[in-house]
């Protein structure tokens, strides 16, 4: 039978509950426990698929095609365990399910209420993850902050959960902030006390407190916090600001988090194997020469909009002993100032996914610059589509070529709507989503990087390369290096005679891991290193990846 851990947050939002959940998952897995992690989000959207990246950040896509919160990316990267649509729950999806049941008559004419029906649905979702994942421990992160109206049904549900499984089979962790007041020179505990008081008023007594701080927390202060909050001093866990999120599991391990959680759950504290993770963090902290990577996007004002792309670049840099010098380049700014100006001195260019017209011309200009100046280039999803448009206009002689998404009346729709999308009306959850196979062409850059004939990648798109133009592209020098197994859909393209120019319709960033970077990203960083004096790139490639158990 599974054990359950619930993680709440107080004082401020964005306090790092997702990283705590992912880190605890890593620590439990290092002790031999199977782990699954789910996120309860208090917003009324059914999923984040139609939300603006400026409001929500990246949409992370699971293997089974769920559009989810970016925290699921952290869960997968830290635990190297695939999550599913069951691991992402929103208030909107809960209410949708309950209302559908009411319409079907499942409640036999009863009055449908927040308690017990909404809270019961939430509890059922948590139990479903446990039964489907065969996890020894299910970790649940509750989004939002204690005290928010939106979070109340979730907090009530996890309080009720205690009656479902018994007090010895679950643990409550509360993540809070200790602000430092410069004028008094003190860390203040009162916000934490009030946050725990609010949590206790709901009926939840935390077993462990994780205290975020930018400086050391004294033993006296830990005793004070524990005394006021009803938590043993040893269970007051400091979590100081770290230089990397990948250092957080090591910090929490040193502070005894996993030991305390296992004690509450009555589980054995097996020996931990974090040696490979320590090696990874050590490489991250002691990199080789830096590579300048330009990320050309539409949403660069919010870094979280491209979180998995940035992490994938970091993973590749760790493997290649490189320091990531990331330059955020606004695609619209390129339209104003020119690609040659804004991309001068870059060792590689990445154009990630996106939607809509805004910034597209800037992306096309960046791709042309990378192609003509032989700068390593990687395009992802819309990045591949804009690479196709750039080639069509500037090399294949197709004046006015573009995507049907951007201009329905274009004379040359080199990118067009997938046939199965023709009659789709709803926006949410209707794209080509999840894992699909891709057959790699022999003798290509892609084959060298992947080393496999068939690979499986995650998708999120409605538009695809228009096969009416495939022969023209092939004749003009384009290489189709990856297709669907039936050869119908173009999934991966590259250019001959260029140091590194490839683009894919899928999202490889979702499969990159700290100890196992995605081949396309590692290839990009290797190519970027080739532009450095005395490049060590090829020798480093032969070292292989860090095997994290």
Swiss-Prot record:
PROSITE patterns: GATASE_TYPE_1. Mg(2+) binds at residues 71, 141. InterPro entries: Class_I_gatase-like, CTP_synthase, CTP_synthase_N, GATASE, GATase1_CTP_Synthase, P-loop_NTPase. Residues 292-534 form the Glutamine amidotransferase type-1 domain. UTP binds at residues 13, 188-193, 224. Residues 1-267 are annotated as: Amidoligase domain. L-glutamine binds at residues 354, 382-385, 405, 462. Its EC number is 6.3.4.2. CTP binds at residues 13, 148-150, 188-193, 224. Pathway: Pyrimidine metabolism; CTP biosynthesis via de novo pathway; CTP from UDP: step 2/2. GO terms for biological process: 'de novo' CTP biosynthetic process; pyrimidine nucleobase biosynthetic process. Allosterically activated by GTP, when glutamine is the substrate; GTP has no effect on the reaction when ammonia is the substrate. The allosteric effector GTP functions by stabilizing the protein conformation that binds the tetrahedral intermediate(s) formed during glutamine hydrolysis. Inhibited by the product CTP, via allosteric rather than competitive inhibition. It catalyses: UTP + L-glutamine + ATP + H2O = CTP + L-glutamate + ADP + phosphate + 2 H(+); L-glutamine + H2O = L-glutamate + NH4(+); UTP + NH4(+) + ATP = CTP + ADP + phosphate + 2 H(+). Homotetramer. Belongs to the CTP synthase family. This is CTP synthase. It comes from Synechococcus sp. (strain CC9605).
């Amino acid at each position: 039978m599974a054990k359950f851990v619930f993680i709440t947050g107080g004082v401020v939002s964005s306090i790092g509950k997702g990283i705590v959940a992912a880190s605890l998952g890593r620590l439990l897995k290092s002790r031999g426990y199977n782990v699954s992690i789910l996120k309860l989000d208090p917003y009324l959207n059914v999923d984040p698929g139609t939300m603006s990246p400026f409001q929500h950040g990246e949409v992370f896509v699971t293997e089974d095609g769920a559009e989810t919160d970016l925290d699921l990316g952290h869960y997968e990267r830290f635990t190297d365990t695939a999550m599913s649509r069951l691991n992402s729950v929103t208030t909107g999806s809960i209410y949708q399910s309950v209302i559908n049941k009411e319409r079907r008559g499942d409640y036999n004419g009863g009055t449908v209420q927040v308690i017990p029906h909404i809270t019961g649905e939430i509890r059922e979702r948590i139990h479903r993850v446990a039964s489907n994942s065969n996890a020894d421990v299910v970790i649940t992160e509750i989004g939002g902050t204690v005290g928010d109206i939106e979070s109340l049904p979730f907090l009530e549900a996890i309080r009720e959960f205690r009656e479902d499984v018994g007090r010895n089979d679950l643990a409550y962790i509360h993540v809070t902030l200790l602000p430092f007041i410069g004028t008094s020179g003190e860390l203040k505990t009162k916000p934490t006390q009030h946050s725990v008081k609010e949590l206790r008023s709901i009926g939840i007594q935390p077993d462990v407190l994780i205290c975020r701080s930018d400086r050391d927390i004294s033993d006296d202060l830990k005793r004070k916090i524990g005394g006021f909050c009803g938590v043993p001093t040893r269970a007051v866990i400091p979590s100081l600001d770290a230089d990397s999120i990948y250092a957080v599991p090591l910090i929490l391990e040193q502070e005894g988090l996993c030991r305390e959680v296992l004690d509450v759950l009555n589980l054995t504290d097996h020996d931990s194997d974090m040696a490979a993770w320590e090696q990874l963090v050590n490489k991250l902290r002691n990199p080789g020469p830096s590579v300048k990577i330009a990320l050309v996007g539409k949403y660069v004002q919010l870094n979280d909009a491209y979180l998995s792309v940035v992490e994938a670049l970091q993973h590749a840099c760790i493997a290649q002993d490189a320091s990531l010098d990331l330059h955020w380049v606004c695609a619209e700014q390129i339209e104003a100032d020119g690609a040659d100006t804004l991309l001068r001195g870059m060792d590689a260019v990445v154009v990630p996914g996106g939607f809509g017209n805004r910034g597209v011309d800037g992306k096309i200009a960046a791709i042309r610059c990378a192609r003509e100046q032989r700068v390593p280039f990687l395009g992802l999803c819309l990045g591949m589509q804009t690479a196709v448009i750039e080639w069509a206009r500037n090399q294949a002689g197709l004046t006015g070529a573009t995507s049907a998404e951007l201009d329905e009346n274009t004379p040359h729709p080199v990118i067009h709507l997938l046939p199965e999308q023709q009659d789709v009306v709803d926006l949410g959850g209707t794209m080509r989503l999840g894992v699909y196979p891709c057959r790699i062409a022999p003798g290509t850059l892609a084959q060298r990087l992947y080393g496999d004939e068939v690979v499986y990648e995650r998708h999120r798109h409605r538009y695809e390369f228009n096969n009416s133009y495939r022969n023209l592209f092939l004749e003009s020098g384009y290489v189709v290096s990856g297709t669907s197994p039936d050869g119908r859909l173009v999934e991966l393209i590259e250019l001959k005679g260029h140091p590194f120019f490839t683009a894919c319709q899928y999202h490889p960033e979702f499969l990159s891991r700290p100890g196992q970077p995605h081949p396309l990203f590692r290839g990009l960083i290797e190519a970027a290193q080739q532009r450095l004096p005395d490049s060590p790139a090829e020798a480093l490639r032969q070292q292989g990846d860090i095997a994290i158990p």
